[in-house]
């Protein structure tokens, strides 16, 4: 299985002036689902509504071959991105390296981000594809983009509530194949 690190829609990617056939040639089996990450963050931070969120995740499902869609690596953070807890806080990234290194969410920012994080994990862990949790996200690690997202795991200082809720969602996912290989049908109320 070869999963590529393609940050955009891999079905229609143009790189260096050339259309790439990542999912339609003999290149990649699937990709890291950065479009899902962006849609989840934008939706939970209130930058897009439910219809736009649905349109963005539906375009992935519609554009990708089924075998690539069901093998998507569904991510919220990676070694190159802002940590999901920090991203969901809605705070602006500081301008300097020193400010980024020293930054920690306030209690109110952390609580807001954590509520959004529970919703984010619910969405990502119950979507078709392969969920991937970047080390420390399940423990409440914070950090801006590389290298500030690559800190040491907080042994002994984990946010146990996040860890326990993620574990419960993983158990729920394992309880039914519908979560990994089922279909999504949008219902509007």
State where each predicted segment sits.
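Active-site-proximal helices and loops of the catalytic beta/alpha 8
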Residues: 1-72, 123, 140-168
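Catalytic-core region of carbohydrate-active enzymes that cleave or remodel glycosidic bonds
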Residues: 10, 46-139, 156-157, 173
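Carbohydrate-interacting/catalytic domains
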Residues: 18, 111-114, 126-133, 137-189
């Amino acid at each position: 299985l070869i999963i590529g690190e393609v940050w955009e829609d891999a079905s229609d990617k143009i790189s260096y002036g050339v259309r790439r056939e990542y999912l339609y040639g003999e290149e990649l089996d699937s990709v890291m689902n950065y479009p899902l990450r962006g849609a989840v963050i934008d939706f939970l931070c209130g930058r897009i509504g439910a219809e736009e969120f649905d349109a963005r995740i539906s375009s992935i499902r519609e554009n990708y071959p089924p075998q690539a869609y069901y093998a998507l690596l569904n991510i919220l953070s990676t070694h190159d991105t802002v940590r999901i807890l920090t991203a969901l806080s809605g705070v602006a990234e500081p301008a300097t390296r020193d400010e980024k290194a020293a930054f920690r969410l306030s209690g109110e920012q952390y609580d807001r981000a954590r509520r959004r994080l529970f919703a984010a994990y619910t969405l990502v862990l119950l979507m078709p594809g392969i969920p991937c949790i970047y080390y420390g996200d399940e423990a409440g690690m914070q950090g801006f983009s590389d290298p500030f997202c690559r800190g040491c795991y907080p042994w002994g200082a984990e946010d146990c509530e996040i860890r326990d809720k993620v574990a419960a969602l993983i158990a729920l996912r394992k309880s039914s194949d519908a979560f990994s290989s089922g279909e999504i049908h949008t219902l509007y109320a």
